[in-house]
Amino acid sequence: MKTWHMVVVIGFLATLAQTSLALKEEDCEVCVKTVRRFADSLDDSTKKDYKQIETAFKKFCKAQKNKEHRFCYYLGGLEESATGILNELSKPLSWSMPAEKICEKLKKKDAQICDLRYEKQIDLNSVDLKKLKVRDLKKILNDWDESCDGCLEKGDFIKRIEELKPKYSRSEL
């Protein structure tokens, strides 16, 4: 009888340890958010077939930029990808596995997948553009898919950002 209770207690503790060690979204933010967004874009018939999921993921990856593009590269979703562990995404997705669990499996295959982090966004309403580096000003324009032809000095970049600010900044009411 005591042995049975001990087995139950050990089983409970093992389950508790497993859930506390589970991957959290902030531990692997790019993976979790990208997998969720991709899974939400799939229709029900595609979700059932892992081959269709792989094809859809490759198409999805063509439109990605920055960190998501790098994530696609690591998984093998791009033509230029060196490796391919796409089935580690497609099969669990076809089984309706949650994004956190999928990313946990992907991390075991390739740890650098969870090293991807989103960069902090610059709040244009509160930041003094004059205090930013030219590199940061260029990044703002690049994130907006805008260019600054003929910009040579910091003041030129600031002027261009100020021109485009009303178009891109989200003003809270």
Curated annotation (Swiss-Prot):
Xref: InterPro entries: ARMET-like, ARMET_C, ARMET_N, EF_Hand_1_Ca_BS, SAP_dom_sf
Superkingdom of source: Eukaryota
Coiled-coil annotated residue ranges, if any: none
Gene3D superfamilies in the cross-refs: SAP domain, Saposin-like
Assigned GO CC terms: endoplasmic reticulum; extracellular space; synapse
GO biological process: dopamine metabolic process; dopaminergic neuron differentiation; neuron cellular homeostasis; neuron projection development; synaptic transmission, dopaminergic
Compartment list: Secreted
Leader sequence residues: 1-22
Alphabetical list of SUPFAM superfamilies matching this protein: SAP domain
The protein's role, per its UniProt record: Required during the maturation of the embryonic nervous system for maintenance of neuronal and cuticular connectivity. Essential for maintenance of dopaminergic neurons and dopamine levels.
Family recorded in the similarity comment: Belongs to the ARMET family.
Protein name per the record: Mesencephalic astrocyte-derived neurotrophic factor homolog
Gene behind the chain: Manf
